Structure formats: C-alpha cells, structure tokens
Amino acid sequence: MKEINIIDFGLMGKQISALFYLLGYEIDVYNKSKLNIYEFEKQIKLLQRKIDFSNFNAGKINIYQHIEDLKNSLTIESLNEDLNLKKEIMQILRDNNIVFSNSSSLSMDDLNCDFIHFFNTIYIKLIELCGSNLERFTPLKDLKKLGFHIICSKGNRGALANLLLFNEISSFFKIIEKYDY
C-alpha cells in the first residue's frame, strides 16, 4: 500500500487526508491534539459525492500525537500559516522524509522545501506545484487519474488562486468605498 504522512488535521489536513485515503493510501496523520474522527468521516462522504473514486480502494488511516512516531515517508505539511511552527516541524521531518508544504501564503524560500498547494475546497481539482524536486511527489499520477489539474508555478509568495482572491476582495472594498455602502 502506498503511504503518505499528513501534518496537522485542520481544514486542509482533513481534506488532503480524506483524498489520499480514498485513493487507497495508508495515511499517517500527525496532530498534537486528539482528533475528531467523525469530521474525517464527513469529509470522506463529501468527497465521495463530488469525485468518482470507483477505480480506487479505500486506504487506511493511522493517527499519531507524537511526530517522532511517523514513518519515513512522503509528507505533506498543512499546518496553520505560522512560519516558526512550520520551520520547527520541517526541521524534525527533513532528515528522513520528502516534505512538501501546502502553505498558501508563505514562499519556498521561507520554508526551504517544495510546495504542493491543494485549493480549498479540495474537490476543485486544482493543484499548484512549485519546486526543484517535483518528481519526488509520486502521487501526481493518481491525482491526474481523478482529473486534477496541475499548475507548475515559480513559487512566489502566496498561491495563484489566493492572488486572484485578494484582487477580488480589494475590488469589493473599492466598490464599498466608492458607493459609500
């Protein structure tokens, strides 16, 4: 069975974990606090309604509260956008794992690792990749089978979709200001 580590079980961590679980991976999730597995099950059901996983068999999930217990494996970091916390976790993981960050606001230079950014919600089927060792992200083949679109970017700060979103938000506030809402 293919294996992948997911660091943190927040908004994106749950979605990424459910996606790879449904793709048949053994998911090793690290989260400091105890997980609500019901939230994971809800995410699985939602993804099954949105994406056809009929060509895949469900995987397995293991949950760890100590990062040292994770297996040496491909790892996706999906922590909150806290640079110091991300750096601390990356330092622990980097020796024995291939680590990709799902950060949407930091740059590759900030974390010194490659990025794989899944968009929220994950069933949008859009992934932004940036880095110099992208061939090490072996699940791309499975994601492409599901119809995910892969964008390779230069790794500027913030994901491409976030840059579009910030522009929309800025336009929204300009309209409010202009028309005195």
Regions picked out by a protein language model, each given a short descriptive name:
Residues 1-54, 62:
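NAD(P)+-binding Rossmann beta1-loop-alpha1 motif at the extreme N-terminus of oxidoreductases
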